[in-house]
């Protein structure tokens, strides 16, 4: 995400469902310092906050877990703070659905 200019610093995080586990990026790590050894693993069905890994999971782990728990069709959750989306949100402006697939599933604005 950072390489594409979609995210900066340590903001944003990613989770991935693997069987009954959720693999999730740790809190406070800049993306260029992230490696597979630092990824936290949690049971997608337990809300106790227990994890395996050297670093604690993202502070937004509950947000990721709840989406993965309620939506079995979802495999990955990406949470980021895109410069352009953040700017438009701050200005209270809509993001137009410029691709027909977005309009087909969500309407004319995001």
Walk through the language-model features, giving the residues of each.
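Glycine-rich flexible loops
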Residues: 1-110
